[in-house]
């Protein structure tokens, strides 16, 4: 049975949620394998907008089920909120979701820590202040709380006692959240989840299920925000690449396809290097047409031209076998469109960054292509072909609007052009 992974090929916000929705009816399981409430995946169903930060992107009318894997850090309050929104419109939908008992939790003091640490930095790194970084830090330093602790109150209280002792020693009176506050929060959200009839499982239990059926693995953020290979330190705290499926007990060798999602241009939220960034009226126009404001933070996204060296880097790092291009319609009507083909790095021309260091010092080298009136224009097809030739991976699907149905295969696009 087919196994596919969808990952962001840029700095996140590429439209992965919509792409997952488009494919979801072909898969029995949609699995989130990393990240937390710092991701914002927007979907449209019957002209209504839903923004999921925690939940896998499955359509309400789909037979697919969703799994939240152990590589995530779960904000249970946000999870309950999202489930309640879906339940109000689609009663019983919560029972389609399963949570890995091995997943770590974002706790109230993690959000406090996020604020405290960001305020102490000489230069902010642009955290979403959702507690993601501190939660992953606790995971690595063995100070975290896993979901299964909620089902053993004695063990939970002992763990909270130990963790609070350390945190109060580190932060003193700056930390306002007590261990009792956290315990009450966890019991409250646990009860709310039980009322919603969400399911609990583990990747060990689900391993045979996943291997005997079709699974779509939904990545969060993008390759250039990956903890190991992104523009460190301006990155997220987890894996954004296909190899993140290991947190669900899978290997990348078990994946049949890895699709990278990219915009027809480039955006970035927060601080960090951005070689093709543009400013002024040109940037403002693209930002407004593309509604480039963060689904999680509402922050205006930085905007730039398409960056082919960054895409080549993403292809190599995440083993991309196909591409999906989104927001193609945003560039409609422009006479000329710039594309970065190479970087100049310390006086040398490079087609692909050697490491994430290159992003910090790169000067973009551009070529200029003819624009298009709409996505049925031959110049748009030439734009796609140019990207394919440069990257060495086919663009198989095109998104030209926010709704799930505003997407087609490249073959259908060509047929439509030929029939006009």
From Swiss-Prot:
It is found in: Cytoplasm. One of its GO terms (biological process) is 'de novo' AMP biosynthetic process. Its EC number is 6.3.4.4. Substrate binds at residues 295-301. Its main location: cytoplasm. GO terms for cellular component: cytoplasm. Its cofactor is Mg(2+). It comes from the Bacteria. This is Adenylosuccinate synthetase. The active site is at 13 (proton acceptor), 41 (proton donor). IMP binds at residues 13-16, 38-41, 128, 142, 221, 236, 299. It catalyses: IMP + L-aspartate + GTP = N(6)-(1,2-dicarboxyethyl)-AMP + GDP + phosphate + 2 H(+). CDD domains: AdSS (cd03108). Pathway: Purine metabolism; AMP biosynthesis via de novo pathway; AMP from IMP: step 1/2. The lineage of its organism: Bacteria, Thermotogati, Thermotogota, Thermotogae, Petrotogales. GTP binds at residues 12-18, 40-42, 301, 327-329, 399-401. Disulfide bonds: none annotated. Binds 1 Mg(2+) ion per subunit. InterPro entries: Adenylosuccin_syn_GTP-bd, Adenylosuccin_syn_Lys_AS, Adenylosuccinate_synth_dom1, Adenylosuccinate_synth_dom2, Adenylosuccinate_synth_dom3, Adenylosuccinate_synthetase, P-loop_NTPase.
């Amino acid at each position: 049975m087919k196994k596919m992974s969808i990952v962001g090929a840029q700095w996140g916000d590429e439209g992965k949620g919509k792409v997952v929705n488009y494919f979801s009816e072909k898969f029995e399981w949609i699995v989130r394998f990393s990240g937390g409430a710092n991701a914002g995946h927007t979907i449209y169903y019957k002209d209504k907008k839903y923004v999921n930060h925690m939940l896998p992107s499955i359509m309400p009318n789909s037979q697919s089920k969703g799994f939240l894997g152990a590589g995530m850090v779960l904000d249970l309050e946000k999870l309950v909120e999202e489930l309640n929104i879906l339940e109000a419109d689609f009663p019983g939908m919560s029972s389609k979701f399963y949570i890995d008992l091995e997943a770590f939790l974002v706790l109230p003091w993690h959000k406090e820590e996020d604020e405290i640490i960001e305020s102490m930095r000489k230069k902010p790194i642009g955290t979403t202040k959702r507690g993601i970084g501190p939660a992953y830090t606790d995971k690595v330093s063995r100070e975290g709380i896993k979901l299964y602790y909620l089902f053993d109150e004695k063990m939970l209280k002992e763990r909270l006692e130990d963790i609070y002792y350390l945190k109060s020693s580190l932060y003193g009176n700056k930390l306002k959240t007590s261990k009792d506050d956290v315990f009450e929060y966890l019991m409250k959200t646990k009860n709310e989840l039980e009322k919603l009839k969400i399911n609990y499982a583990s990747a060990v239990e689900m391993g045979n299920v996943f291997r005997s059926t079709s699974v779509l693995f939904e990545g969060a953020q993008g390759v250039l925000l990956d903890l190991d290979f992104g523009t460190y330190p301006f990155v997220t705290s987890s894996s954004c690449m296909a190899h993140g499926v290991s947190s669900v007990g899978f290997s990348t060798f078990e994946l049949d396809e890895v699709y990278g999602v990219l915009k027809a241009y480039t955006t970035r939220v927060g601080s960090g290097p951005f070689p093709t960034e543009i400013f002024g009226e040109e940037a403002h126009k693209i930002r407004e047409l593309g509604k480039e404001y963060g689904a999680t933070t509402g922050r205006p996204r930085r905007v730039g031209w398409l960056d082919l060296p960054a895409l080549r880097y993403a292809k190599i790092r995440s083993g991309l076998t196909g591409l999906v291009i989104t927001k193609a319609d945003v560039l409609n009507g422009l006479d000329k469109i710039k594309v970065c083909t190479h970087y100049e790095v310390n006086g040398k021309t490079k087609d692909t960054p050697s490491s994430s260091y290159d992003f910090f010092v790169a000067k973009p080298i551009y070529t200029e292509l003819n624009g298009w009136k709409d996505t049925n224009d031959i110049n748009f097809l030439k734009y796609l072909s140019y990207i394919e030739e440069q990257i060495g991976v086919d663009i198989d699907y095109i998104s030209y609007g926010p709704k799930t149905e505003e997407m087609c295969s490249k073959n259908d696009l060509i047929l439509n052009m030929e029939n006009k």
